[in-house]
């Protein structure tokens, strides 16, 4: 694997292999010393042009557990804020000897540009580009679902027949896009639920079912997982729904809807959460919730991605 830019690029076998290596990395996390020398001598740069807490820290933890050297770059306070181009930034990192670059950028397609430009000879990981994709989030979501379904027998398995309902601001969600492609590649059945104003143009070409009524979607064959998406108000330049209270009433996972879910249905959220809007506090904190598991699993999955990207080996050094 040279780069990880989109979940659409992954075959089923490739996706399952990443999840299996992530299982090995999760085992590393159970040791007294939670490190492996797999990437000793390698340099990973976290190149973030957008604010991030969970993703940046998760990638940093992943790289350090693999014994890589980590450089954190933030656009704020850097030469980028003075007008430096992506090309010049990439060439600077090339001169510094970066082996892997984790990129988050507000412009859709920026990681693809970086990977195909020839400006830098490094493995590129897309950590979120505009409203396009966020592949490692989808991988950690798939990893979480697979572990909940299969436990210690998860290795080698996909998500065949698993029903996943993704609810909320699909229009602005790179998480929804990456999950739509990855989960279906792994065999899951995905339903998107959103207000008509928050459904993107062209969704008919996605391998998903689209619904506008959350209650009907939840009632049609109990889902195995319900994933709530954050309302991304910072990306909205118009009124996409009447008001927050109305949104929560029609499309939020409130206490009443939580009580109607099947006994084994899990509740997911990529974070950060707007409690009381897309998800109630009771749902977020319930035993069904995998929010904290997703954070922990994110480190294991990102360890797997960095390992496969930078080591050139398919077997983790355990």
UniProtKB/Swiss-Prot annotation:
One annotated Gene Ontology cellular component of this protein: cytosol
Top-level enzyme category: transferase
Stored InterPro entries: Asp/Orn_carbamoyltranf_P-bd, Asp/Orn_carbamoylTrfase, Asp/Orn_carbamoylTrfase_sf, Asp_carbamoyltransf, Asp_carbamoyltransf_Asp/Orn-bd
Gene Ontology molecular functions: amino acid binding; aspartate carbamoyltransferase activity
Taxonomic superkingdom: Bacteria
Residues of the signal peptide: none
Keywords, sorted A to Z: Pyrimidine biosynthesis, Transferase
Annotated catalysed reactions: carbamoyl phosphate + L-aspartate = N-carbamoyl-L-aspartate + phosphate + H(+)
Pathway: Pyrimidine metabolism; UMP biosynthesis via de novo pathway; (S)-dihydroorotate from bicarbonate: step 2/3
GO BP, sorted A to Z: 'de novo' pyrimidine nucleobase biosynthetic process; 'de novo' UMP biosynthetic process; amino acid metabolic process
Sequence positions that bind L-aspartate: 82, 174, 230
Pfam family, one: OTCace
EC number: 2.1.3.2
Binding site for carbamoyl phosphate: 54-55, 104, 134, 137, 271-272
Family membership: Belongs to the aspartate/ornithine carbamoyltransferase superfamily. ATCase family.
Quaternary structure (record): Heterododecamer (2C3:3R2) of six catalytic PyrB chains organized as two trimers (C3), and six regulatory PyrI chains organized as three dimers (R2).
NCBIfam families in alphabetical order: asp_carb_tr, PRK00856.1
Function statement: Catalyzes the condensation of carbamoyl phosphate and aspartate to form carbamoyl aspartate and inorganic phosphate, the committed step in the de novo pyrimidine nucleotide biosynthesis pathway.
Protein name as it appears in the record: Aspartate carbamoyltransferase catalytic subunit
Biological source species: Clavibacter michiganensis subsp. michiganensis (strain NCPPB 382)
Higher taxonomy: Bacteria, Bacillati, Actinomycetota, Actinomycetes, Micrococcales
The encoding gene: pyrB
């Amino acid at each position: 694997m040279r780069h990880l830019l989109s979940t659409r690029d992954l075959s089923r076998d490739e996706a399952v292999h990443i999840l299996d290596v992530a299982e090995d990395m999760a085992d590393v996390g159970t040791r007294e010393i939670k490190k492996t020398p797999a990437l000793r001598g390698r340099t990973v740069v976290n190149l973030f042009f957008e604010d991030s807490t969970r993703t940046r820290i998760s990638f940093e933890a992943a790289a350090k557990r693999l014994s890589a050297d980590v450089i954190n770059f933030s656009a704020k306070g850097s030469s980028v804020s003075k007008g430096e181009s992506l090309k010049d930034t990439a060439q600077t990192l090339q001169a510094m000897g970066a082996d892997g670059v984790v990129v988050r950028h507000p412009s859709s397609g920026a990681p693809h540009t970086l990977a195909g430009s020839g400006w830098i000879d490094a493995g590129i990981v897309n950590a979120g580009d505009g409203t396009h994709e966020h592949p490692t989030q989808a991988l950690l979501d798939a990893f979480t679902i697979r572990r909940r379904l299969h436990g210690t027998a998860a290795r080698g398995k996909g998500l065949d027949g698993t029903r996943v309902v993704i609810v909320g601001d699909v229009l602005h969600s790179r998480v929804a896009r990456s999950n739509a492609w990855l989960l279906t590649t792994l065999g899951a059945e995905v339903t998107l639920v959103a207000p008509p104003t928050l459904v993107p143009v062209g969704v008919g070409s996605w391998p998903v079912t689209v619904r506008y009524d959350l209650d009907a979607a939840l009632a049609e064959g109990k889902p195995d997982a319900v994933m709530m998406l954050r309302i991304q108000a910072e990306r909205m330049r118009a009124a996409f729904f009447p008001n927050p209270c109305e949104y929560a009433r029609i499309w939020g996972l409130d206490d009443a809807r939580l009580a109607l879910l099947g006994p084994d249905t899990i509740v997911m959220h990529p974070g950060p959460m707007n409690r009381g809007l897309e998800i109630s506090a009771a749902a977020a904190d319930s035993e069904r919730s995998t929010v904290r598991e997703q954070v922990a699993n994110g480190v294991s999955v990102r360890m797997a991605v960095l390992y496969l990207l930078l080591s050139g080996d398919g077997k983790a050094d355990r």
